[in-house]
Swiss-Prot record:
Annotated Gene3D superfamilies: Ribosomal protein L31
SUPFAM superfamilies for the chain: L28p-like
InterPro entries to which the protein is assigned, alphabetical: Ribosomal_bL28/bL31-like_sf, Ribosomal_bL31, Ribosomal_bL31_A, Ribosomal_bL31_sf
Entry keyword annotation includes Ribonucleoprotein: yes
PROSITE patterns according to UniProt: RIBOSOMAL_L31
Organism: Deinococcus geothermalis (strain DSM 11300 / CIP 105573 / AG-3a)
GO molecular function: rRNA binding; structural constituent of ribosome
Subunit structure: Part of the 50S ribosomal subunit.
NCBIfam families: L31 (TIGR00105), PRK00528.1 (NF001809)
GO cellular component: ribonucleoprotein complex; ribosome
Similarity comment: Belongs to the bacterial ribosomal protein bL31 family. Type A subfamily.
Job description of the protein: Binds the 23S rRNA.
Record protein name field: Large ribosomal subunit protein bL31
Keywords: Ribonucleoprotein, Ribosomal protein, RNA-binding, rRNA-binding
Amino acid sequence: MKKDIHPKAVPAKIIYQGKVVMETLSTRPEIHVDVWSGAHPFWTGEERFVDTEGRVDKFNKRFGDSYRKNRK
């Protein structure tokens, strides 16, 4: 086998919004992330109100009964 063909693993800091949130091993000393499980609503239990309508409601609001009448 060849020796020294793999990159060296060094302690790495995972950085989220300018703060170190975790440490691990990597080939890079710092890893900047946009999404982190510690701040995600699913993992924190935090509820966020999302103002979206369902597809059917959006369709009915847009076309109403006119779609059903023309379909006959």
